[in-house]
Amino acid sequence: EVVDFVVPLGATIHLAGDTITLVLSSMAVLMMAGTTPTLATMVPFIFMLGVTMVAAPGIPGGGVYATLGLLEKMFMFTSGQQGLMIAIHFAQDSFGTATNVSGDGAIAILVDKLFKKSSVSEEVKENIV
């Protein structure tokens, strides 16, 4: 069924909660360091983060660890700033996880509707009628 395909795929590559959190957290850390992030600096970071997040979900909290290399190379984050990013990420990770799971469910419903398949099996429908 559609759900059997979409939900595991979404758990692997759909990490909207982590991505949003990491972008906003990196902007906050940059501003605390006295640097104002611009659209020209953030757009390449967001694109690279999107690619990185596909490979990140192998371990819990893996997104922030995969992002540290980008932050160091693109924004010259120091080890203190990287530690702050890890702390911020772990403090709010449950909210990002809730966003990811809700998004996966919504995408599964949309794909199910797109292919005009019911999420209720025929056997269950017969038992209801």
Residue locations for each model-derived region?
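Cytosolic juxtamembrane C-terminal amphipathic helix followed by a basic/polar low-complexity tail immediately after
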Residues: V101-V129
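Re-entrant/interfacial helical elements at transmembrane boundaries that shape
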Residues: D4-L9, T21-M31, P44-I46, G61-K73, ...
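Hydrophobic transmembrane alpha-helical segments of multi-pass transport and channel proteins
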Residues: T12-I20, G50-G62, T78, F90-A106
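Short, conserved aromatic-histidine micro-motifs
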Residues: S79-F95, V124-I128
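Helix-loop-helix junctions within the multi-pass membrane cores of secondary transporters/permeases
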Residues: E1-M53, S121-I128
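Alpha-helix N-cap/start motif
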Residues: E1, L39, G61, T78-S79
